C-alpha cells in the first residue's frame, strides 16, 4: 500500500486542451478536519488506509496542498435540466484534480467537490456544504455495497468556513472517484456550439480510454453508443429493483460510463410508492421513481442527437430501441432473485407487477418486505408478512400464486434463506438515518456518520447491535423530500 506522496498521475483529460476545461486552483477551506474516509475507495488508489489519519490527508483534500503531478481542471459541458437545454454549465464548484494510475493500470479521477469558484460557477460561491457532502459520500458507498454501478467517495473534509444556503452552514469538500467524469452534457456542449472537431476529439478520447473493446467494431462510434445504452439499461434496472430514486436526472448528471453520478436529493423508497418524488424542487414529478425508466431513455436520445455528427440517425434509433427490452430483462432477472426464484416463466413479470400493486395500496415497506420474505420457508414467510397489507384477500391471492410458482421449481427451498438474504439488504440508506448522522456531524460529532457508513458497507449481513438501522422509519422520517440546495 502507498503513501500519499507515492501516487502516480496521468492526466489524460487535461491534455485534451483548454477547449475542454480550464485550469483552476482550489480555494482552501479553513481549519480542515477529516469527517470520514472510505477504506475500500482508498484501496482503488492503492492508498494505505492509515494515510487518512495524517495531517497531510486533510490538507490535500481541502485545497491547502496540491500534488506536484496534479493539474486541476474545471470541465465545460452543457445539458438538459428538467427537459430544457442549458447551453453552458460546467464544473461550477468541482475540480478534476488529477488522474491516478493504480498498480493494476486502472485510471481513477480525483474530483474535488466544493473547491471554490470557477469560470462556470454561474454566480454561485463554488462551495459545497457539509450536509450535501455527507449525503453524497453515504450514497456512493451504499450503492457500491449493494452492487449498483456508481462513482465512489474517497473522503469528506469539514471546515469552519461559513457558507449561506437557506441558513448559515459550514463548507466541506468531498473527493469523488470515477474512471471518467465525462457526462452526456459534454457531448451536447460541443454539438450545440457547433464545434465538430472538438466533438470528435472528445468522442475519440472516450472510445480509446473507456470503450477500447469497441475500437475493432465495423462502426466503433455506434458500438460505443450501443454499449452506453446497454450499461444504462442495466443501471436503471438496479435502481428500480432496489427502490433508488436519483432525483435530478438531468443530462449533465448522466455519466458516459453508465454509473450513478452526481448525488443530490436522492432517496430509497420507504413504503412502496411508484409515484414517489424525492426532490422538493420537482413539483411536476419529472424525476419520480416511476419516471426514471422513460427519462433514462429520453436522456439517451439527447446523447444520440449530439452524436449525429459522427453516426447516422437510423442506426442510432436502432440502438436506442434496445434500451427498454434490455432494461426489462435486467429488471425481471433482479426481481426474480429478490423473490428467491431460480428459473424463468412467462408470467413472472405479471407476478411482480401484482405484488407491487398490493404493496402500493397497502403502504408496505419495499426493501424490508423482500428481506422478511426470505426469512422462512415460503408458506411461513407469507404468513409473516401478511399483516403488512391492507387488502388481505388480494395479498392471499398473490401469495397462493407465488407459493405455487416456487413449488414448480425443483429444490427451490434448498438454500432459499441464504439465497434471498444475499440479494435483499437488511440495511438501506434511508433519508432519516442520513439526516440524523448529518445533524450529529454539524454539531461536531462524526461518530454517527462513520457508524452508518460501516453498517451500510455490508448491507446483506446482520450486524450485532445494529437492529435500529434495519427498522421501519418513524412517521416523520418517511418519504422525506430533499432540496437541491447543496
Curated annotation (Swiss-Prot):
Belongs to the SELO family. It comes from Pseudomonas putida (strain W619). The gene is ydiU. ATP binds at residues 90, 92-93, 113, 125-126, 176, 183, 262. It comes from the Bacteria. Keywords: ATP-binding, Magnesium, Manganese, Metal-binding, Nucleotide-binding, Nucleotidyltransferase, Transferase. The lineage of its organism: Bacteria, Pseudomonadati, Pseudomonadota, Gammaproteobacteria, Pseudomonadales. HAMAP family: YdiU_SelO. This is Protein nucleotidyltransferase YdiU. The active site is at residue 252. Its cofactor is Mg(2+); Mn(2+). The keyword Metal-binding applies.
Amino acid at each position: 500500500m502507498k503513501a500519499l506522496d507515492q501516487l502516480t498521475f496521468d492526466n489524460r483529460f487535461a491534455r485534451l486542451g483548454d477547449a475542454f476545461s480550464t485550469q483552476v486552483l482550489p480555494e482552501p477551506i479553513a481549519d480542515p478536519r477529516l469527517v470520514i474516509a472510505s477504506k475500500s475507495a482508498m484501496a482503488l488508489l492503492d492508498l494505505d488506509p492509515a494515510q487518512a489519519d495524517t495531517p497531510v490527508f486533510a490538507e490535500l483534500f481541502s485545497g491547502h496542498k496540491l500534488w506536484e503531478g496534479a493539474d486541476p481542471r474545471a470541465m465545460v459541458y452543457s445539458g438538459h435540466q428538467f427537459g430544457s437545454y442549458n447551453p453552458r454549465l460546467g464544473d461550477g464548484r468541482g475540480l478534476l484534480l488529477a488522474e491516478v494510475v493504480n498498480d493494476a493500470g486502472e485510471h481513477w479521477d480525483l474530483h474535488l467537490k466544493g473547491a471554490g469558484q470557477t469560470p462556470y460557477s454561474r454566480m454561485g460561491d463554488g462551495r459545497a456544504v457539509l450536509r450535501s457532502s455527507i449525503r453524497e459520500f453515504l450514497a456512493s458507498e451504499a450503492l457500491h455495497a449493494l452492487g449498483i454501478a456508481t462513482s465512489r467517495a474517497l473522503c469528506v473534509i469539514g471546515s469552519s468556513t461559513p457558507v449561506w444556503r437557506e441558513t448559515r452552514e459550514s463548507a466541506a469538500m468531498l473527493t469523488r472517484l470515477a474512471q471518467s467524469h465525462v457526462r452526456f452534457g459534454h457531448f451536447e456542449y460541443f454539438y450545440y456550439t457547433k464545434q465538430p472537431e472538438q466533438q470528435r476529439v472528445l468522442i475519440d478520447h472516450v472510445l480509446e480510454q473507456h470503450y477500447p473493446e469497441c475500437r475493432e467494431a465495423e462502426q466503433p462510434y455506434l458500438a460505443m453508443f450501443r454499449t452506453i445504452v446497454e450499461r444504462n439499461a442495466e443501471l436503471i434496472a438496479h435502481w428500480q429493483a432496489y427502490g433508488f430514486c436519483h432525483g435530478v436526472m438531468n443530462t449533465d448528471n448522466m455519466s458516459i460510463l453508465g454509473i450513478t453520478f452526481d448525488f443530490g436529493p436522492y432517496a430509497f423508497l420507504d413504503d412502496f410508492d411508484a409515484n414517489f418524488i424525492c426532490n422538493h424542487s420537482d413539483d411536476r414529478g419529472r424525476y419520480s421513481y416511476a419516471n426514471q425508466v422513460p427519462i433514462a431513455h429520453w436522456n439517451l436520445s439527447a446523447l444520440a442527437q449530439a452524436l449525429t455528427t459522427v453516426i447516422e440517425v437510423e442506426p442510432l434509433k436502432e440502438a436506442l430501441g434496445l434500451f427498454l427490452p434490455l432494461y426489462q430483462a435486467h429488471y425481471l432477472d433482479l426481481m426474480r432473485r429478490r423473490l428467491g426464484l431460480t428459473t424463468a416463466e412467462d408470467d413472472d413479470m405479471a407476478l411482480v407487477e401484482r405484488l407491487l400493486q398490493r404493496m402500493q395500496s397497502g403502504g408496505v415497506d419495499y426493501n424490508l418486505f423482500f428481506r422478511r420474505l426470505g426469512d422462512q420457508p415460503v408458506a411461513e414467510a407469507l404468513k409473516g408478512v401478511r399483516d403488512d397489507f391492507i387488502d388481505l384477500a388480494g395479498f392471499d391471492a398473490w401469495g397462493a400464486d407465488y407459493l405455487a410458482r416456487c413449488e414448480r421449481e425443483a429444490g427451490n427451498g434448498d438454500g432459499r434463506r441464504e439465497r434471498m438474504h444475499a440479494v435483499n439488504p437488511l440495511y438501506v440508506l434511508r433519508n432519516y438515518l442520513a439526516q440524523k448522522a448529518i445533524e450529529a456531524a454539524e454539531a461536531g460529532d462524526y461518530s454517527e456518520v462513520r457508524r452508518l457508513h460501516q453498517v451500510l458497507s455490508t448491507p446483506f449481513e446482520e450486524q450485532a447491535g445494529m437492529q435500529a438501522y434495519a427498522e421501519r422509519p418513524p412517521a416523520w422520517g418517511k418519504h422525506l423530500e430533499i432540496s437541491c440546495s447543496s
